[in-house]
């Protein structure tokens, strides 16, 4: 069992234990639980079982979905028409069109709202995401107020409300921290993307902050009403519990204020360091605040999840990068403000399409690590005489040299420093020590008879591995895919250099012409002479594509069930989403959008 799988199962075991333990009374351990404490216990249980129900529903959906994909793949290996799988379920098609794949309003989902070219204020959630967020937010609001005796005295009502909001804030820290990790087990088990879980993590954080603020204001209101402001100041000064409660709430408010999209995107590395520091302070403050309360056991679980996830990440980094001379990175400048980074791995791994990894380059950014799509992988044997004859499994692994490559576009921060260092190096290349963490993600599209891959600019790095995998599987007879179309939109023909060597390899693969068609669209050609089509299966056009027309054509000529995947700008993703949704009730087509946000 791999380290990642061990982490996934252990995280689930910890969470299951917390669901049964989280409903502890909210105070007065020496005096026994009050009726209000028991109500808080019940509400904590209800919230925990809501998590279980939601997660269980998605897991069941994924099991059914993967079973259907498996049956479809086996049934279509020798089926050239696949007509049975081309027809959609009318009810499920409508569900996808109007809910599962639908943006919140009309067509805009992934295209960012911007105050200027440098200030991004975020995107709109999808209809399904918004329904979940509203439902969970509403559930927390309801749980904050139900069963409270609103007819009681001011002090009694404030005390009940204070305890209720405090308990809910602590309980909600469990999913908040679980969803923050890169090794979140539910990405795999629920089939929910890291991008969506990141969105949920941010909103769970806002809920925790609001409940912490409500908890603090309820205490302040009760104290001031009873004994006045001077007594409040004295209580904060002389009570460690209250003082650290104030520190915790202040830390939560700071996290809320420094986390808007505009700040995260403009100053990501600075944001990340401040975020970790503020979260650490908030957790320490809450820990001390709960020192004599039963809810401290929930903080044991919260901190354990965070420490365990970080420990497993460290173990994974050591396993991937220690030995055989360590991991090295070859960085090469490419036309169009980009670099190719080839990571020569200390230890091999099994590469799958759709994966990404985090890279650390101390010589470029000492404390930073960034995620990038893995565009290519090569594996070769080290046949040097120094290695000698392989005598055991470890010798065999050491003789296998794996390299993974990625294309990184020049932006700001780390990518800017990386590009400049390569550009100033002799021949536009340099080699440095590096660490790689991963791989994360991965997706298999070989159960679809028709696959259409859309990419804009650097988004091609996500789609190239799928092209290679499907063409190889087609030649081996291990895929249902009979029609594969790659649509790549670039600004200049010089961007073709990013993947030229890889595409040369793909175009020379057996039976490539029988399955693969490539459409290139150059939006800003310098002259018409730059636009030429090498063959009927690789065609180049000036300008932007008509997304709806190309997808409609694919529907007319496609085979069996289809998948349309897009990785690129927000505008392209929204256009492709709209075109696919227009056909989901008449064509068995699934939509896949690859994006990475923070």
Name each region found by the language model.
Residues 17-38, 85-121, 137-152, 180-189, ...:
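Membrane-proximal N-terminal segments immediately preceding the first transmembrane helix
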Residues 25-50, 112-125, 147-164, 190-200, ...:
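Juxtamembrane membrane-interface segments at transmembrane-helix boundaries in membrane proteins
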Residues 56-79, 178-186, 260-266, 307-325, ...:
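Transmembrane-helix exit/juxtamembrane "anchor" motif
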Residues 56-60, 130-145, 164-182, 200-221, ...:
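Hydrophobic alpha-helical cores of multi-pass transmembrane domains in eukaryotic membrane proteins
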Residues 340-351, 355-452, 468, 523, ...:
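FAD-binding FR-type
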């Amino acid at each position: 069992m791999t380290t990642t799988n061990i982490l996934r199962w252990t995280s689930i075991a910890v969470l299951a234990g917390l669901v049964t333990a989280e409903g502890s009374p909210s105070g007065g351990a020496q005096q026994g639980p009050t009726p209000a404490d028991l109500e808080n216990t019940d509400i904590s249980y209800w919230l925990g079982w809501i998590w279980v129900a939601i997660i269980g529903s998605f897991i069941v959906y994924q099991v059914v979905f993967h079973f259907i994909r498996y049956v479809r793949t086996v049934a279509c290996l020798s089926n050239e028409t696949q007509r049975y799988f081309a027809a959609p379920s009318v009810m499920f098609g409508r569900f996808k069109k109007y809910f599962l794949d639908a943006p919140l309003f009309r067509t805009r989902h992934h295209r960012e709202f911007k105050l200027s070219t440098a200030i991004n204020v975020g995107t709109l959630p999808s209809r399904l995401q918004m329904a979940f967020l509203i439902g969970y937010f509403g559930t927390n609001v309801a749980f904050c107020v139900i069963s409270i005796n609103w007819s009681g005295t001011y002090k009694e009502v404030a005390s009940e409300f204070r305890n209720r909001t405090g308990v809910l804030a602590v309980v909600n820290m469990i999913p908040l921290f679980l969803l923050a990790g890169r090794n979140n087990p539910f990405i795999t088990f629920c089939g929910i993307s890291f991008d969506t879980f990141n969105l949920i993590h941010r909103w769970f954080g806002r809920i925790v902050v609001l409940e912490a603020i409500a908890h603090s204001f309820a205490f302040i209101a009760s104290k001031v009403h009873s004994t006045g402001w001077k007594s409040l100041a004295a209580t904060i000064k002389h009570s460690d519990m209250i003082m650290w409660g104030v520190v915790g709430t202040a830390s939560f408010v700071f996290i809320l204020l420094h986390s808007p999209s505009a700040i995260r995107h403009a100053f990501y590395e600075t944001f990340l360091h401040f975020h970790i520091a503020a979260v650490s302070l908030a957790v320490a403050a809450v820990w001390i605040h709960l020192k004599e309360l039963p809810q401290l056991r929930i903080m044991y679980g919260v901190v354990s999840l965070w420490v365990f996830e970080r420990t497993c990440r460290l173990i994974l980094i050591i396993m991937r990068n220690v030995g055989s001379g360590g991991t090295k990175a070859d960085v090469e400048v490419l036309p169009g403000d980009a670099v190719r980074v080839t990571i020569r791995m200390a230890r091999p791994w099994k590469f799958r399409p759709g994966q990404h990894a985090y890279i650390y380059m101390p010589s470029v950014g000492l404390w930073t690590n960034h995620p990038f799509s893995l565009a290519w992988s090569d594996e070769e044997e080290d046949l040097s005489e120094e290695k000698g004859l392989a005598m055991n499994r470890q010798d065999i692994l050491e003789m296998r040299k794996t390299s993974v490559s990625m294309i990184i576009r020049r932006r700001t921060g780390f990518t800017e420093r990386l590009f400049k260092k390569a550009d100033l190096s002799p021949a536009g290349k340099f080699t440095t020590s590096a660490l790689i963490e991963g791989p994360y993600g991965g997706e298999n599209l070989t159960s679809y008879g028709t696959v259409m891959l859309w990419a804009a600019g650097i988004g091609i790095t996500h789609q190239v591995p799928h092209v290679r995998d499907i063409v190889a599987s087609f030649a081996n007879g291990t895929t249902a895919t009979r029609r594969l179309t790659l649509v790549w939109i670039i600004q200049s023909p010089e961007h073709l250099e990013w993947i030229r060597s890889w595409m040369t390899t793909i175009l020379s693969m057996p039976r490539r012409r029988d399955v693969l068609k490539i459409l290139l669209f150059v939006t800003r050609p310098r002259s018409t002479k730059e636009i030429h089509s090498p063959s009927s299966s690789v065609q180049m056009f000036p300008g932007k594509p008509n997304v709806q027309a190309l997808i409609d054509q694919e529907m007319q000529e496609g085979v069996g069930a289809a998948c349309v995947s897009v990785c690129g700008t927000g505008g392209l993703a929204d256009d492709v989403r709209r075109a696919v949704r227009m056909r989901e009730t008449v064509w068995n087509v699934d939509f896949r959008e690859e994006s990475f946000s923070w």
